[in-house]
Amino acid sequence: MFRGHFEHTIDEKGRVAVPAPFRGALVGLQDERLVLTKFRQDAARCLDVYPLSAWRRLEEKLSSRNRFDPKLLRFRNFYVTGAHECAVDGQGRILVPQLLGDYAGLGRTVMITGDVEMFRIWDKAVWQDKFAADEEKVLGDEEFLGGLDI
């Protein structure tokens, strides 16, 4: 499982280290490959990063749906066609393709955030703004918090 948030730096070749706890989770999943794709929450762009096994489960779910559904087609055009498979190198880094890095507006400093079965890569400034906005929305919504049943 992927949880927590970590600040990392993208090097001049576009590589970024996968946080050590996330590398440990990948070892536990016996996954050596990752799939990166575009994502957006509200107006904040980032990259979703899936272990290959989780990505394959997502593709299986998508394949079981009506492939002619216009909404599903739009989603697949955005989410699946933009996906890029990569390996974690011997130093625990992944190469972020320039097209994906440009989409997410990634600067030199990024935040890598866990989201249970996958993780996200954000530009640090974008993540700080998004986190602050989400904190206000979540903590201010007592009805939602009360209904979580956790």
Model-derived features: where do they sit?
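Flexible "stalk/tail and boundary" regions
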Residues: 1-7, 12-13, 22-86, 90-91, ...
